[in-house]
Regions:
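N-terminal cap/lid segment of alpha/beta-hydrolase-fold proteins
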Residues: 33-80
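Short beta-strand element of the alpha/beta-hydrolase
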Residues: 83-93
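Short amphipathic alpha-helix adjacent to the substrate-entry channel of hydrolases
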Residues: 101-118
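Alpha/beta-hydrolase active-site loop
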Residues: 128-149
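Primarily recognizes the serine-hydrolase "nucleophile elbow" in alpha/beta-hydrolase
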Residues: 142-210
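Mobile cap/lid helix-loop segments that gate and shape the active-site cleft of serine hydrolases
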Residues: 205-237, 243
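Short beta-strand/loop motif that positions the catalytic acidic residue
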Residues: 247-249, 253
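C-terminal catalytic histidine-bearing segment of alpha/beta-hydrolase fold enzymes
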Residues: 248, 258-321
Length: 321
């Protein structure tokens, strides 16, 4: 028979999550799902998907970069389309391992929806510390802009996609702006994103105990480097200029607890930023990625709305005149 304390803990967690959903229901949009129960309007996805061409791995870093880094590029076959959206995609792995292969399925799904996808490597900790991984993403955006004409990319419709530590990096990129400490020295207007799809996002590094992954990434403990922890936390960089965010997160995530998503979502709403939170009930960190299809469908539908030519979010990011 299960221990009464265990039952109480899980009931408390479920009731707290249900209460949170009721409280937040009036701002933004929350989906709560179970496996096999998709909460997605299929009309928001392209019904006719595109084939795509897979390029050989492309080096995106300049010759003087500390490490050679490559990107996997998929070009959708979209005859008659003058310019199409693009997606910068970043894998997870605790900032220290894994690679673009983990995100290949998501990249293919985006390419089928008409996005040029750029699925990148980045430098790993502990050899390289924050903010060097962010610099890799900023360089990838510069490289993507330099290839925009060749690949028929509309640079005002580039979105960011990531999971776990990749979601952290892509969110930091989205919030770094064109000025300030996160923008120097490789940032600028070219790093603007039209929207973000982020799963399992560690949004506030100050919430973690001094575990190896975060300490290796920052290069010290919270007590030793509190300013760096704050600067590296997307939740502490939100302004009303943030692009729209679609977040998905497992409600039973023990590695990156769900309050990283719910608090981030609340902060976005407080700034008037369009956002959606897709809670995967009963899923942990890795299960939320392995069984992600309905969340990704919902996320891509959200991205599709943001990259429409008349999107309000696009007008906010790229005002005319």
């Amino acid at each position: 028979m299960p221990d009464a304390h265990v039952i109480h803990r899980y009931l408390s967690r479920y009731l707290s999550l249900s209460t949170l959903i009721l409280v937040l229901g009036g701002c933004g949009s929350i989906h709560q799902t179970t496996q096999g129960v998709p909460a997605i309007e299929q009309a928001l996805l392209q019904q006719e998907t595109f084939t795509f061409t897979r390029l050989a791995p492309q080096r995106y870093t300049p010759v003087d970069w500390p490490e050679v880094l490559n990107a996997q590029v998929l070009l959708p076959n979209t005859p008659g389309v003058e310019r199409r959206p693009a997606a910068l995609i970043v894998h997870g792995g605790g900032w220290r391992n894994r690679g673009p292969a983990d995100m290949e399925g998501i990249a293919e799904q985006l390419a089928q929806q008409g996005y040029v996808t750029v699925n990148i490597e980045h430098r790993f900790s502990p050899e390289y510390r924050f903010p060097e991984q962010l610099h890799d993403l900023q360089q990838a955006m510069a490289w993507l802009h330099s290839n925009a004409d060749q690949w028929q990319v509309d640079v005002e419709r580039i979105v960011g996609v990531g999971f776990s530590s990749g979601a952290h990096l892509i969110s930091l990129l989205a919030l770094s702006g064109s000025e300030g400490p996160l923008a120097a020295p490789h940032g600028g207007e070219h790093t603007r994103l039209a929207a973000v799809l982020a799963g399992g996002l560690p949004s506030d590094l100050l919430k973690f105990n001094d575990g190896r992954l975060v300490v290796d990434f920052i290069g010290g403990t919270r007590a030793e480097k509190p300013e760096a922890y704050a600067l590296a936390s997307p939740a502490r960089q939100i302004t009303d200029q943030a692009p729209p965010f679609f977040l998905f997160h497992g409600s039973w995530d023990q590695l990156v607890p769900v309050d990283h998503a719910t608090d981030f979502y609340q902060a976005l709403n407080a700034q008037g930023v369009e956002s959606e939170l897709y809670l995967q009930r009963g899923r942990g960190h890795f299960a939320s990625f392995l069984f992600r299809r309905s969340a990704i469908d919902a996320g891509i539908a959200f991205l599709n709305r943001q990259v429409q030519p008349d999107s309000k979010s696009r007008q906010k990011l790229y005002p005319s005149g």
